[in-house]
Amino acid sequence: MKPPFQQALGIIRQLNRHGYEAYFVGGAVRDLLLGRPIGDVDIATSALPDEVMAIFPKTIDVGSKHGTVVVVHEGTAYEVTTFRTDGDYEDHRRPESVTFVRSLEEDLKRRDFTMNAIAMDEHGTIIDPFGGQEAIEKRLIRTVGEADARFREDALRMMRAVRFVSQLGFSLAIDTKKAIIANAPLLAHISVERMTMEMEKLLAGPFAAEALPLLAETGLSTYLPGLAEKGEWLRRAAAYRWPWLAAREERWALLCHALGVKESRPFLRAWKLPNKVIDEAGAILATLAAVPEPAAWTNEQLFLAGLKRALSVEVVRAALTGKPYEPQHDELRRRFAALPIKTKGELAVNGKVVIDWIGKPAGPWVKETLDAIWRAVVNGEVENEKERIYAWLMERSRTQEKNC
C-alpha cells in the first residue's frame, strides 16, 4: 500500500476495531489506480459523525450535519465522512438534505463519475460496484447511473467532467457527452466562483488543449462568463501549448489572447478573479503587444517589466507560437542581470534630492526628471552614482535651455 494510505491506515483500523466499516474513497483511490501522484486521502465509514468523534481524541467538526468530521491522525488531518445518500437537489447545486446509511454501495452510488466511485479497504482490496476500473482502463469519464439525473442534481458536474478531460486526458463517454449537451443551460444556476474554480483547474491541466474545444462542442461555453460568442475561438485554442504555462496569470493571459479579447480587465473581472491576477494578466498582454518579438526587448522595457513578468511574456509567446521558450529565458536572465539597477528604488537619487538640486517647487516635473534619470542609468548613459547623475542632469538642463 502506498505511503499516503499507510499513514491513514490507523483510522481505518480503529474504526474497524469498533465494529464499523471504513474505506478509502474518491480521487485518491482513482489516482492510485492511474499511477498518478496521490493527493488528499479521504475516508468513508458506516460510523455516524458522533461515533467518529467519540472514537478519536482529536477531531474537528467541519460539517457533521452533512456527515463530515476531520480526524487528526499522527499530525495529519483526514476527512472522515459517514456513508450517506443525498435528498432532492435545490437549484441544481446542492442536496436539500442528506440521510446517513450503513451501506458503502449506497454511498458510492451518489458520486459523480464511476472513476470516483471506487473504494479500497485496509488490505488494499478494491470495491468497484459501478465499473470505475473499466472506465479507467478505457480512459472514459462516465457518470454513475443515468447521466441526465447526475447533471440535473448538480450542474457543476458538467464542468467537472470537462475539467477531468484536461487533467487526465480521458474522453467523455457518449451518453455522458450527450447529457452535457442536453443539460448545458443548467450551468446558469451555478455561481461564477464555482465555475472559475473548475476553469482554473481545466486551464492548468496537461490536456487543456483537448478540453477547451469541448466547452464549445457541449454548449457549456454559452453559460460561462464572456464565452457565449467564442465557440470558434475555443476550438482554435487547441493549437496552443497550455502545459508550458506555470502561473495562473499566464494561463488567463493566454486565454484572453486565444479568444481575441480586446479588453482583458472586464473579461477577467466577469470571472471574479483576484485583482492581482487581473492586473498581472493585463500587464503580460500589454507587454506582449509592446514587444512584438523576443529580439525586440529594450533595456527600458525589460527594466519596467521586471524579470518575472518578462519571463511570463516569453512563455506566453512560446505557447502561442509553439517555439521553445528556454533560449529567450536564458537571454532575458543574462540581460536583466547586466542592468545597472533592477528597480527604481535602487536609483542613487530620489525626488527630494532632485528638488534640492533644481531649486524648484515640487510638481509633475519631479517624476519626469526621475524617469529621465533611471532611463539614462538603464541605457548606460550615466553611472548610478549621485555625483555623476548630478553632472548629467546639469548638462541635460543646459542643453534644454539652449534648445528653448
Curated annotation (Swiss-Prot):
Cofactor(s) recorded in Swiss-Prot or TrEMBL: Mg(2+)
Keyword Hydrolase applies: no
Record's catalysed reaction(s): a tRNA precursor + 2 CTP + ATP = a tRNA with a 3' CCA end + 3 diphosphate; a tRNA with a 3' CCA end + 2 CTP + ATP = a tRNA with a 3' CCACCA end + 3 diphosphate
Residues that, per the record, bind CTP: G27, R30, R111, D154, R157, R160, R163
Signal sequence range: none
Domain of life, source organism: Bacteria
Keywords: ATP-binding, Magnesium, Metal-binding, Nucleotide-binding, Nucleotidyltransferase, RNA repair, RNA-binding, Transferase, tRNA processing
Residues that hold ATP according to the record: G27, R30, R111, D154, R157, R160, R163
Keyword hit for Transferase: yes
Annotated SUPFAM superfamilies: Nucleotidyltransferase, Poly A polymerase C-terminal region-like
GO molecular function ontology, one term from the record: CCA tRNA nucleotidyltransferase activity
Gene Ontology biological-process annotations: RNA repair; tRNA 3'-terminal CCA addition
Function (record text): Catalyzes the addition and repair of the essential 3'-terminal CCA sequence in tRNAs without using a nucleic acid template. Adds these three nucleotides in the order of C, C, and A to the tRNA nucleotide-73, using CTP and ATP as substrates and producing inorganic pyrophosphate. tRNA 3'-terminal CCA addition is required both for tRNA processing and repair. Also involved in tRNA surveillance by mediating tandem CCA addition to generate a CCACCA at the 3' terminus of unstable tRNAs. While stable tRNAs receive only 3'-terminal CCA, unstable tRNAs are marked with CCACCA and rapidly degraded.
Subunit structure: Homodimer.
Family, per entry: Belongs to the tRNA nucleotidyltransferase/poly(A) polymerase family. Bacterial CCA-adding enzyme type 3 subfamily.
Miscellaneous comment text of the record: A single active site specifically recognizes both ATP and CTP and is responsible for their addition.
This protein's name: CCA-adding enzyme
Organism (species): Geobacillus thermodenitrificans (strain NG80-2)
Origin organism lineage: Bacteria, Bacillati, Bacillota, Bacilli, Bacillales
